């Protein structure tokens, strides 16, 4: 013997097993506490469904509405909410300590675009060979980046050395 499948969502029409319900009609007016079978009859006469909107209340609150339309609206609302959610990505900008001015400007434009999109930016400064002896140049460059983006971004992870590279993470304000 298998249990009947459980339905998602509110109980409707004959699934409501309470003797009385607090009825709200299609216009949103309170009709008061009435027997469930009378509420179902009223719903059928109006060509609507009796939908339980607040099952935990005593007596449960039920509303007269078109269940198909109600379900569609709820689905639409959920989809809109899902679209508005944006996962914050961490974009990476790679530089060298002796970066040329034009290259630096191009990297900064890309960084500003990432901030406008709401993404975090990881600035990676890579040292090669003897450049490791001049880490202060890297710190100067990262401080310059930090000062330029100060109005629109905040430092989430201050510059630190990891192996042969210096890393700083910035997040939009």
From Swiss-Prot:
Key word Cell membrane present: no
UniProt entry tagged with the keyword rRNA processing: no
Main location as per UniProt: cytoplasm
GO biological process: ribosome disassembly
Quaternary context: Monomer.
Gene Ontology CC terms, in alphabetical order: cytosol; membrane
HAMAP family reported in the protein's UniProt record: IF_3
Gene of this entry: infC
Name of the protein in question: Translation initiation factor IF-3
Any one Pfam family match given in the protein's UniProt record, by short name: IF3_C
Known function: IF-3 binds to the 30S ribosomal subunit and shifts the equilibrium between 70S ribosomes and their 50S and 30S subunits in favor of the free subunits, thus enhancing the availability of 30S subunits on which protein synthesis initiation begins.
Keywords per UniProt: Cytoplasm, Initiation factor, Protein biosynthesis
Gene3D superfamilies according to UniProt: Translation initiation factor 3 (IF-3), C-terminal domain (3.30.110.10), Translation initiation factor 3 (IF-3), N-terminal domain (3.10.20.80)
Family according to the record: Belongs to the IF-3 family.
Source organism superkingdom: Bacteria
A Gene Ontology molecular function term of the record: ribosome binding
Compartments, record wording: Cytoplasm
């Amino acid at each position: 013997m298998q249990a009947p499948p459980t339905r998602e969502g509110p109980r409707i029409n004959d699934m409501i097993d309470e003797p009385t319900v607090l009825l709200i009609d299609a216009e949103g007016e309170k009709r008061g506490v009435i027997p469930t079978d009378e509420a179902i009859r009223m719903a059928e006469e109006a060509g609507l469904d009796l939908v339980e909107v607040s099952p935990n209340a005593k007596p449960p609150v039920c509303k007269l509405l078109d269940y198909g339309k109600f379900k569609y609206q709820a689905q639409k609302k959920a989809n809109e909410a899902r679209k508005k959610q944006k996962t914050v990505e961490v974009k990476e900008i790679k530089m060298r300590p002796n970066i040329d001015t034009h290259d630096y400007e191009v990297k900064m434009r890309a960084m500003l675009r990432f901030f406008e999109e709401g993404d975090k930016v990881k600035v990676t400064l890579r040292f090669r060979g003897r450049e490791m002896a001049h880490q202060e140049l890297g710190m100067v460059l990262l401080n310059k980046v930090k000062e330029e983006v100060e109005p629109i971004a905040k430092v989430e992870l201050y510059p630190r050395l990891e192996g042969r590279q210096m890393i700083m993470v910035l997040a939009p304000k």
